Amino acid sequence: MLKDAREKYVVMSDANLAVNFDFTAMLEQHIESGADVTIAYKKQEIPVGMKKPFDITKDLYYTFELDDDGRIRQLRINPEDEGVQNLSMNIYIIEREFLVHMISEAYSKGMVYFDRDLLAPNLERLNVRGFEFNGYLARISDIKSYFDENMKLLKDENLDGLFGGNPIYTKIRDDNPTRYIQGSKAKNIMSADGCIIEGEVENSILFRGVRIAKGAKVKNCVLMQD
């Protein structure tokens, strides 16, 4: 239980981000600034797949207005603004005891959303700070964005941006490296262990155990694990 934990700080994050994020600098800024809450954000245009009219039954996204000290003074919910925005990554650092207090307050009032219901109405009272992230970030909001963000990793600069820093550990399954059978053709692909390529494949990502049979032609695809 959160109440019984001994750690002083809590990190909260959504699960729809592909990002190589080191929390050390963010935590240091949080402590030095004396913030109640620190929220990571990235300067970018709002992805088309995220834009939608305000609807409390949908996932919400937020943009910020910050002052010169990095304090968040205004929080906008599901805006359709054009151009580069301070777009929240929905990654937060907060003291555990303060979070427990906020959760209790939210529960007693039937509140649901951390940003909309707890932070936005209290920006003058709370010290809420922004932490700018400058690295590679992929936001997965639907099937199309999942496909698009996977395909972007076929470019070296994007692949290096995600995996070039700290290592990212994934599920381990010992298997043979991808086998390229004589007569097969492969161009600009990423393939995991256990794949067998007998046919032709181009501009595609192959998950573990995928087999491209002889005579098959695959292009611009993401093929999932067997």
Model-flagged regions — what are they?
Residues 1-150:
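Unchanged
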Residues 97, 105-226:
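Left-handed beta-helix
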